[in-house]
């Protein structure tokens, strides 16, 4: 069986580093190939709290590659940049058309709204709740929400749960559960 793969899209500036790193790390522990793509190239991205992350590739170079999941980290202004990007729109449209999963955490669900990605139910950082509700989404305060092929989560403090849910969906509950003890997580 082929290894599952995840694409994490980094905004040019302002992605939430915990959501990028924790999500990617947990997925890698779950034996999922993780590709970090820079929206504005493969140069280091300055995240919301000042950390710099070096993408593996430019998003445009993997735009047509198939991934099991495309993940949008939150943070500001990173989430707004994702919401305004035509390239992100095209990647999400392709992911929906191919039946792949999409994950968005923190404020990143606003990119789902702006790019017309449908979901029955979402969650997010409280700062964008009203915008999502006004955009027609049914909203939940749950820490992680799975609605069809869309996985959303609330913010940095829910990044482990978000990532474990993705591992569960791609590799099964046993694989996800097996990762908890070695990371000393208390969920």
Swiss-Prot record:
Domain of life: Eukaryota
GO cellular component: cytoplasm; mitochondrion; nucleus
Pfam families: DJ-1_PfpI
Keywords for this protein: Cytoplasm, Lyase, Nucleus
GO molecular function (one): glyoxalase III activity
Annotated catalysed reactions: methylglyoxal + H2O = (R)-lactate + H(+)
Functional description taken from the UniProt entry: Catalyzes the conversion of methylglyoxal (MG) or glyoxal (GO) to D-lactate or glycolic acid respectively in a single glutathione (GSH)-independent step. May play a role in detoxifying endogenously produced glyoxals. Involved in protection against glyoxal-induced cell death.
Family as reported in the entry's similarity comment: Belongs to the peptidase C56 family.
Official protein name in the record: Glutathione-independent glyoxalase DJR-1.1
Organism this protein belongs to: Caenorhabditis elegans
């Amino acid at each position: 069986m082929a290894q599952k793969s995840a694409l994490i899209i980094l905004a040019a500036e302002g992605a939430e580093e915990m959501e990028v790193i924790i999500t990617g790390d947990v997925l890698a522990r779950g034996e999922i190939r993780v590709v970090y793509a820079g929206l504005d190239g493969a140069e280091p991205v300055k995240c919301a709290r000042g950390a710099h992350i070096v993408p593996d590739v430019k998003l445009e170079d993997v735009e047509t590659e198939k991934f099991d999941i495309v993940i949008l980290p939150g943070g500001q202004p990173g989430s707004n940049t994702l919401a305004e990007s035509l390239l992100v729109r095209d990647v999400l449209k392709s992911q929906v058309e191919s039946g792949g999963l999409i994950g968005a955490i923190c404020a990143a669900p606003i990119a789902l709204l702006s790019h017309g990605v449908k979901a029955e139910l979402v969650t997010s950082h409280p700062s964008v709740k009203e915008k999502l509700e006004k955009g027609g989404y049914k909203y939940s305060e749950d820490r992680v929400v799975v609605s069809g092929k869309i996985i959303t989560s609330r913010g940095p403090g829910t990044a482990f749960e978000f990532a474990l849910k993705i591992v569960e969906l791609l590799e099964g509950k046993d694989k996800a559960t097996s990762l908890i003890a070695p990371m000393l997580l208390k969920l």
